[in-house]
Amino acid sequence: MAYTSANAGQVGPARGASLDRALRKLFPSTSKLTFNPLFRAAVNAFDVVPRLMFPEFRTLPPNHLRIRIGVGNRILNNQTHFLVHARDFWMFVFSEGIATMHSDILDIGVGCGRWAHWLRDYNFRGRQFTGTYVGVDIDEEAIAWCQNHYDSERFRFFVSTDTSVSYHHTAASQSVYRIPLADDSFDLVFSNSLLTHLLEAELENYLRESYRLLRAGGAMMHSHFNIEHPPATYGTRHTFRHQMGNAQIESEAQPEAAVAYHTDFLFGLCRKIGFSSCEIVHMPGGAQHQPILLCRK
């Protein structure tokens, strides 16, 4: 398949590895820092001058929301990363015929719209996106920002009642979360790095929900941490040394901060759910992108 990279899992040593490991022991999840008022004020203050200098940055969400979703682990100077990171994903999706400009698309864990803004702001081969795009997330602040910055004709965003330790949500815990959308209603269900924060029971729940919501022939695409295709940060920021069931986790104190799985386990689970085909694909750029679990209904 196009864009699949045999070398995407190869990684090398990184500078500052010791410092990075030390910082990650103190702060396994930078997302939690973005709820601190002092941290928010500081990082948003650094955003003022770039917004004045570059018109392209003025439509971006505030810096603390960008940091919360993970923009290359950068606290500052992350604007370009936010703007371009989804480009290869959509080029792959449309060039491979996984979705079209008229498709119904569900983004689970939409955050502040890093993937959605491409379908709002850009044309593909001269055609504008005219389908429907639904984004769901547990982060009420991020969803509110999206609702205020996207047109309601094509885009709809709503808050999930699911829970997450890493994302500081306070809703009542549920063992099984059902996304309040109709069966067989989407051509593409995808997420960016959602699975990297899901332990086994929640992982299975979201894979089953993806299957339920897809139309026949539709595709599920979830980026994730994969032991057989390790990230560029493997051996520095990430080691996944702790096992919890079929999951490999980075931090026992905050197990949802970073979760990885083996390919065989993911494929077996997806086939049990009912998907007809499963594969791991990589976007251009190699290990800087997470591998994607691509399954067809």
In which residue ranges do the predicted regions lie?
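A short glycine-rich, Lys/Arg-flanked "PGG" loop and its adjoining helix->strand segment in the class I
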Residues: 204-216
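Short catalytic micro-motifs in class I SAM-dependent methyltransferases
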Residues: 193-194
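A conserved beta-strand element that flanks and buttresses the S-adenosyl-L-methionine
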Residues: 190
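Helix-capping/helix-break motifs at membrane-protein junctions
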Residues: 199-200
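Conserved beta-strand/loop positions that form the S-adenosyl-L-methionine
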Residues: 108
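Class I (Rossmann-like) S-adenosyl-L-methionine-dependent methyltransferase catalytic domain
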Residues: 2-103, 112-178, 205, 219-297
